[in-house]
């Protein structure tokens, strides 16, 4: 099942994608190409993983981590499909990060790896937008690098776990203005989804609608105002957002 939320005639409508159309709870059909998408659900806590793909640490001049490197993203950074990402004024290097996002469906603490997938509700597409200027200095862990308003585009759909046969065998691609800039596969993760869920739940309780951004492969490049970022995760969806200058 692929579900989401749209704004229609001033009201929030919960929708399901079926045969290329969006159907709301009243049975009314909507065109996905014209729909005003909202976040597909209301996320709780947003966790991110840094350096979780083979080769990504190397392109940054860093060593691969021995255990998951975690950070949090603030709720104000969340952004729906097609909404504009604001490029902060005065920064030199802003880039996309195409990621598979895991959505928790069942609460748990100290979850063993063997049971971790039982706690996964589904998946969506994320773009972990980052200001490279603030990575590798006193702002790491990257609150200032990754926590700006509009820096976590998410969506457009929540895809139920049963629709994704193997989340560790998916292609990821990022395009800027239609040009392929980043390509990888989820089997390049250093830490698998069960390992990540088990690791996080050792020291905190995971709750329904917590979101885990599982990291990005190598292939980052700069984006500017006027660019359009398109993130694709096989079997999950396509997330697109334009870049605009920050409004003051």
For each of these PLM feature ranges, what is it?
Residues 1-68, 162-165, 173, 179-180, ...:
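N-terminal non-catalytic cap/leader segment that marks the start of a structured domain
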Residues 30-35, 64-65, 79-91, 138-139:
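Short acidic (Asp/Glu) patches
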Residues 36-38, 59-60, 85-94, 108-115, ...:
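A generic local secondary-structure boundary/capping motif
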Residues 48, 95-97, 207, 224-225:
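Residue-level recognition of short, solvent-exposed, well-ordered loop/turn junctions
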Residues 56, 64, 132-248:
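Catalytic-pocket segment enriched in acidic/His residues
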Residues 64-81, 96, 230-234:
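Structural signature of FAD isoalloxazine-binding scaffolds in flavoprotein oxidoreductases
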Residues 97-127:
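RNA pseudouridine synthases
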């Amino acid at each position: 099942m692929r579900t989401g939320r749209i704004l229609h005639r001033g009201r929030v409508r919960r929708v399901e994608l079926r045969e290329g159309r969006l159907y709301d709870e009243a049975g009314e059909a909507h065109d996905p190409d014209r729909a005003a998408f909202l976040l597909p659900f209301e996320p709780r806590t947003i966790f991110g993983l840094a350096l979780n793909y083979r080769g990504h640490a190397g392109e940054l001049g860093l060593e691969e981590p021995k255990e998951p490197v975690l950070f949090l993203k603030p709720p104000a950074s969340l952004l729906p499909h097609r909404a504009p990402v604001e490029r902060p004024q005065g920064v030199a290097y802003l880039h996309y990060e195409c990621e598979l996002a895991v959505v928790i469906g069942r609460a748990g603490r100290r979850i063993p790896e063997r049971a971790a997938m039982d706690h996964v509700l589904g998946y969506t597409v994320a773009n972990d937008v980052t200001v490279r200027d603030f990575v590798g200095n006193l702002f790491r862990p990257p609150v200032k690098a990754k926590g700006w308003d509009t820096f976590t585009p998410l969506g457009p759909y929540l895809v139920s776990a049963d629709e994704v046969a193997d989340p560790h065998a998916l292609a990821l691609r990022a395009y800027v203005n239609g040009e392929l800039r980043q390509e990888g596969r989820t089997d390049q993760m250093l830490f698998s989804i069960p390992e990540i869920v088990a690791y996080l739940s050792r020291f905190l309780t995971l709750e329904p609608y917590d979101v885990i951004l599982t990291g990005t492969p190598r292939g980052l490049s700069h984006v500017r105002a006027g660019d359009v970022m398109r993130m694709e995760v096989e079997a999950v969806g396509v997330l697109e957002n334009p870049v605009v200058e920050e409004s003051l």
